[in-house]
Regions:
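Short hydrophobic/aromatic patch on the recognition helix
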Residues: 42-52
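Alpha-helical DNA-contacting segments of helix-turn-helix folds
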Residues: 52, 59-66
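Hydrophobic alpha-helical connector segments
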Residues: 61, 72-100, 112-115
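Amphipathic alpha-helical interaction segments
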Residues: 17, 36, 86-90, 94, ...
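Solvent-exposed, amphipathic alpha-helical segments
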Residues: 21-28, 69-80, 152-163
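Hydrophobic/aromatic-rich alpha-helical bundle segments in the mid-to-C-terminal region
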Residues: 106-110, 114-117, 121, 136-180, ...
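Basic, helix-initiating cap at the start of DNA-binding domains
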Residues: 1-28, 32-40, 57-60
Length: 190
């Protein structure tokens, strides 16, 4: 027996559809209106307003959703397996695949929101562990702080997301990872 009543399932499905549609609409047109988002989702504006009372509440939900997606990607990147550099490449590949979801947030200034930054930092804690592991094994330079490496990674990812239209996903992964790896590879890198 399903514990969620059909109305609840519909509401969750509509919310997910609205978030996905908002990310896509705002990625292609940062000035997209709530009406544009509703149309893209194939829903009426009243449905959108039942979930999000304003553009800001929709953007806040998009920020939360983006961090949740990043959490899922990092968790699914098998961060404890293989070499630290290979684990970092998997993280980069996963985050780059979310580019369209993050682009509107960068353009809207989400990176200035302290709550978003705190949640993003939590999402990247496994990356801190990867870097530390790499430093201990000699794969990653020990003379560069973990904080610097993780901050540089996030900046490179943000640059790739901003250039989304100019780069293929594969090229973005190679540029982000290649640039990072050139600066952090230790003497015992594979």
């Amino acid at each position: 027996m399903n514990a969620d009543p059909p109305a609840r399932v519909d509401a969750e499905r509509n919310r997910r559809l609205l978030l996905d549609s908002a990310a896509a609409a705002l990625a292609s047109d940062p000035d997209a209106t709530l009406g544009d988002v509703a149309r893209r989702a194939g829903l009426v504006r009243a449905t959108l307003y039942r979930h999000f009372s304003s553009r800001e509440s929709l953007l806040e939900a998009l920020r939360d959703d983006a961090v949740e997606c990043a959490n899922d990607v990092v968790a699914g990147s098998r961060v404890a397996e293989d070499s630290a550099l290979e684990a970092l490449r998997r993280v980069v590949t996963g985050i780059v695949s979310l580019g369209a979801r993050f682009r509107p947030l960068l353009l809207e200034g989400a990176t200035q929101d302290p709550e978003f930054l705190r949640k993003r930092e939590q999402a990247f804690m496994p990356v801190v562990m990867i870097v530390r592991r790499g430093q201990q094994s000699g794969e990653i330079r020990g003379d560069v702080s973990v904080r610097w490496i993780v901050t540089a990674l996030m900046a490179l990812l943000a640059a790739a997301v901003r250039m989304d239209a100019d780069l293929s996903e594969e090229d973005a992964v190679e540029l982000v990872f290649g640039t990072l790896a050139l600066g952090i590879q230790g003497t015992h890198s594979p």
